[in-house]
Regions:
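Structured mid-to-C-terminal alpha-helical surface segments
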Residues: 1-45, 56-63, 68, 72-237
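Glycine-rich beta-strand-to-loop/alpha-helix junction loops that act as flexible
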Residues: 47-52
Length: 237
């Protein structure tokens, strides 16, 4: 989709394993700028997850990210937000596959990457968790390449709240990337771990669950033996 020379030039920003991964990074960057220049997205969605960490906080990014994850700021019908997303992404990514569940809305855009390799961009919105501990945080974001130039203001969480939701994800699923993201930030002393844990417990309370240190430790011992957890990071560095 993007000329190879433009992708090669973008390697100065990200040094991923393949040109297709570099191209995906460019697609994500442009998509974010398109999205957050739409007033409905700016008002309704908070950008979070590993891609948010590596696009907005960790510079240069510590690992490859492939999806865009949002959460709604408030409880409201998702239809108008989906229309806004499609309004800015469909013109250059085509019609997406859509999946609506009780907890989320997903749009999957498929495109031909470099060398005609099939690729996709998944945009997922958590439509049930209308909860934040700290006020939303605004970050200026820009892209400057021969393929696309633009800027926007992205609504996200404060770093310690992003990490608290990462800590919850580490407990809930079997993806080594969650552990890697937490290790990367804490090993560089970029955040206060005690504050992260306090926010984590507030999310647990909102979810109606109690996770003690022993329960979390047992969960991690089991994950260490899981093959999917062990190999999750293989292609992301």
């Amino acid at each position: 989709m993007i000329p190879e020379s433009y992708i090669e030039s973008w390697r100065t920003h990200v040094s991923w394993q393949t040109l297709a991964m570099v191209e995906q990074d460019m697609v994500i960057s442009r998509a974010l700028i398109n999205l957050y220049n739409h007033p409905k997205i700016q008002d309704s969605l908070i950008f979070r997850g590993g891609t948010a960490l590596n696009k907005l906080i960790i510079v240069p990014p510590s690992r490859y990210s492939e999806d865009i994850d949002f959460v709604q700021r408030r409880s409201e019908p998702i239809g108008e937000t989906i229309d806004a997303i499609r309004n800015v992404l469909d013109p250059w990514l085509g019609d997406p596959k859509r999946k609506l569940t009780e907890r989320s809305a997903k749009l999957v855009y498929q495109y031909a990457a470099i060398n005609n390799l099939p690729s996709k961009l998944k945009v997922e919105i958590n439509t049930t968790e209308h909860f934040q501990v700290l006020p939303p945080f605004k970050v200026l974001y820009s892209m400057d390449s021969d393929w696309f130039k633009g800027s926007c203001t992205i609504m996200t969480h404060e770093l310690e709240e992003l990490l608290a939701t990462k800590l919850r994800a580490l407990y809930q699923r079997r993806k080594g990337r969650d552990l890697f993201d937490l290790w990367f930030v804490f090993s560089r002393k970029l955040a206060d771990i005690d504050n992260v844990i306090k926010i984590f417990h507030k999310y647990c309370k909102n979810d109606g669950i109690a996770i003690t240190k022993d329960i979390f430790h047992s969960n991690m011992v089991q994950k260490r033996l899981n093959k999917d957890f062990q190999v999750d990071m293989n292609v992301l560095l």
